[in-house]
Amino acid sequence: MHGLLLAAGLISLPLHVLAHPQPSSTSLAGRAVDLNEYRIGHRSSYTSNDEMMKQPSIASFRAGTYVEVATEMVKQTMPNMEFRLVDDHYIGQSGIGHVRFRQTMHGIDIDNSDFNVNAYDNFYQIGQDGKVLSHGNSFYTGPAPESSPVQKRDFSDPMQALHGVRKALNLPIKAEGATVENMSEHKVMFKGTSGALSDPTAKLCYMAKEDGSLALTWRVETDIGDNWLLSYMDAKDTGKVHNVVDYVAHATFQVYKWGLADPTEGNREILTNPWNLQTSPLTWLADGQNNFTATRGNNAIAQYNPDGGNDYENNYRPSPKNLKFEYPYSANMDPPKTYIDASVTQLFYTSNVCHDLYYMLGFNEKAGNFQVNNRGQGGKGNDYVILNAQDGSGTNNANFATPPDGQPGRMRAYIWTRANPPRDASFEAGTIIHEYTHGLSNRLCGGPANSRCLNAIESGGMGEGWGDFYATAVRLKPKDTRKTNYVKGGWVNNSPKGVRMYPYSTDMSVNPLVYTSNNQLNEVHAIGTVWATMLYELLWNLIDKHGKNDGPVPIFKNGIPSDGKYLAMKIVMDGMAIQPCNPNFVQARDAILDADKNLTKASNKCEIWKAFAKRGLGVGAKFDPKNRIGSNEVPKECK
């Protein structure tokens, strides 16, 4: 999703709205279409480890690989269901095997019906073979079509679906004279169109609807820059849109060092070889085939993009022959293009440090991270992050597009016009970390091959909340305590109030948000603020118990971060991979508890419960999209 801004028009909480009202970031830019109308609904269930222990028949299976165990579990749990194994399974850094299955009907995918199993493998977890930690499920259980629509040819031509999505969403794509080419069974590509950054495609698939029925659709994929859309068009009535998913969420280096949120927190420094060879063994300036003297390498490619276009490879980027990426910058310089070298360098630096830190915490090749060359470590390569500094396609925002593993991510950092002179988003680390974290959460939740699992309203909200949480955790200072409050986007927006409803604070009088606040919120950034507030409580509960490592990287003991800050970042990340597709807050909370149970044998159970319960997500909390029920209760052993 788009990354930073808070939408206007929030329903009446007793809120002191601290952000300037902004247009909703879930709209199609300039085309008056609200994508919130087409969000996928919450259908997933999540069975936590505590619930699994009550069902011993499905908690443990005959010893085998984690994939075999997971497959057997799905067969037993969903007998007579047709499904396929998704080719993105892996064993995570914490020893959990993550396996995902897609439900099919007559050989056609049900695109929003998934089953994910978190299981152990005896090779990695001695004595745990055959055991399942938890699972998530959104399989369709309603009536099935009697026969295959492919045999009956009971669907429209895919070109009609492309025309339908153009008209329904008012897309700037022209398809007159375009041709259709077969890519694979049930999937085609449209050649000869204009207005999209790549050739649109269409795939025949089913969608499980919230009313319990099944719709045959054409999934039309269109990348138009500010939006990278998967539009599910009815395969019979191609003017009808069922759902829409948007992938976009909005040497020596002289930079603001990692940990400084923006130029007000410190001065620029010259850093020599700032990469971590454990996580970037090719350095930031090589990809195993080529050595570069510009801001490109295995993890990212950064450039100036004033026209907002797609031809990034031929765009300008700093390329000092002596590898000294040292350029002048002051927040008082104007116009912004006069310091573009410094801007691109800063964006390249911050994004690469994100890559390295997240790698240490578990976002590696197998988990679907962003690299050209995966060096035989699993996953799909050829997907560095395209970093566009001073992108001309917008202002006062930033965004990140996350297609599935094997396709490059794309970040756009804009100029902000709230100050005079304008401010460049590349210099606010919190904005860049927030955007990069969209790539992290979209690749982990649902698995590397599925970037459609943060589309439901609470799921999308958590996508925004994770971005704020990681950006805030990184900026903590040595003297900070749980009484320290932080705003989001204060510098770039030229406002001490930032761009969120409230500061992040453990003080209920400063930030009163609780789980039931979501009943009055219908915009992902607002809902994300509630989620990040809960995670901020969790962060400080773990810091109070384990202390705070103020260094730039975690210190591990037996695979566990030794301090509370990095431990919180680790279990939140592990929870992303454990939870089901399109989770709600309750399911994501349970996934974090299961992540801690796996990593530390639940030694932080009460700290986690108390953090969530303080903000209304306690034992009795229940999800209902229209009437969430809050709870401040913790388990009896935590009272």
Swiss-Prot record:
Disulphide-bonded residues: none
Swiss-Prot/TrEMBL keywords: Glycoprotein, Hydrolase, Metal-binding, Metalloprotease, Protease, Secreted, Signal, Virulence, Zinc, Zymogen
Database matches in Gene3D superfamilies: 3.10.170.10, Neutral Protease Domain 2 (1.10.390.10)
E.C. code: 3.4.24.-
Active-site residue list: 435
Source organism per UniProt: Arthroderma otae (strain ATCC MYA-4605 / CBS 113480)
Propeptide: 20-250
Record's protein name: Extracellular metalloproteinase 1
InterPro entries to which the protein is assigned, alphabetical: FTP_domain (IPR011096), Fungal_virulence_M36 (IPR050371), Peptidase_M36 (IPR001842), Peptidase_M4/M1_CTD_sf (IPR027268)
CC cofactor note: Binds 1 zinc ion per subunit.
Primary location recorded for the protein, binned into one broad class: secreted
Glycosylation sites: 291, 598
UniProt function note: Secreted metalloproteinase probably acting as a virulence factor.
